[in-house]
Amino acid sequence: MPNEPVLDQVDRLQRSSRDVTTLPAMMSQWLSTVLPGGATPEITVESGIDSTGMSSETIILTARWEEDGQPVAQKLVARVAPTAEDVQVFPTYRLDHQFDVIRKVGEITDVPVPRVRWLESTGEVLGTPFFLMDYVDGEVPPDVMPYTFGGNWFADAPVERQRELQDATVSVLASLHSIPDAESTFGFLADGQDGDSALRRHFNWVRSWYDFAVPDIGRSPLLERTFQWLEDNWPQEAAATEPVLLWGDARVGNVLYRDFHPVAVLDWEMVTLGPRELDVAWMIFAHMVFQELASLATLSGLPEVMREDDVRATYQRLTGVEIGDLHWFYVYSGVMWACVFMRTGARRVHFGETEKPDSVESLFYHSGLMKRLIGEDQ
């Protein structure tokens, strides 16, 4: 069938057309305006776009300068907003919001986040905004190829250690969701959004994200039916709860680990305010998607990881809060994953890696899962 998902080159994702050879000089000049004493550092680019993210550019570099007569060497990570020409995943990128959230989370919680250093919000230096944070050494369960495919440190670990990592990652959500009065502390995250609740505002944003994706890759009847399903089954009780700070892209692939424990929580592009069920469901659903990918590749994956009952029990033990039903939030997560696949698919078409598909739904590796969740036959 032309609209069935095909596991095609999941190991290849073109991310950016940026020429990193021009970056050292530009970064050195800009850093001289923010470093103590106006020092002009020597910049070495250690690596370009990393192997985990699919949205903002992640560039690792080392800056060397003198401070008070002493040599300083600091390894840094630049998170750079993509250009529109690179077919960005999201309609807009608020690097300033990400910077402020990471800084505040580091100040008021025990969640391990990198130290953020400097923000350039105008886009005048590199063409788009960026911020710099300290480099943190650690391991990430890979997205490419998906960790459920095996042959990586997480998939090959004993079940007990996998569970240890899972529980430690759920504890990140517990800490974030326990920040008091998140609406006040992080109210800037709701700037410019319309809706009578945090969830409604987020839902409206997701719908606009889908509308943003359509012109480059085509409409999805499945997603449009799913949007209607979400409206028809709106979770009134969850929507009425006090919003918490949501990490957004809450999954193991966005954490650096050492010895199976988080040392840096990364990728805050989807950070928002809303019901805690959204983060919890997203973390579980992300693993469901990777399980679907493994199934398409005729692999067993990791069925013991991120089981809902286990995640619920850990979360309740850590927070004292029993989360509500997650079914609606799984469906909602599926819509957002589809929007990501629409944009990464459009990006591959843009960079000549593949032909534009006859049906956008051939890009939805999780379409079978989505149909099951909304009660449609496959």
Model-derived features with residue positions:
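Juxta-kinase regulatory segment immediately upstream of eukaryotic protein kinase catalytic domains
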Residues: M1-I43
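ATP-binding pocket architecture of kinase catalytic cores
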Residues: E46-R225, W234-E242, H261
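Catalytic-loop of the protein kinase fold
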Residues: L245-W247, V252
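Activation of the activation-loop gatekeeper triad in protein kinase-fold domains
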Residues: L266-V271
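Active-site activation/catalytic loop segments of kinase-like enzymes and analogous catalytic loops
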Residues: L278-T319, S333-F351
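Helical subdomain adjoining the active site within ATP-dependent kinase catalytic cores
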Residues: V321, D325, M336-Q378
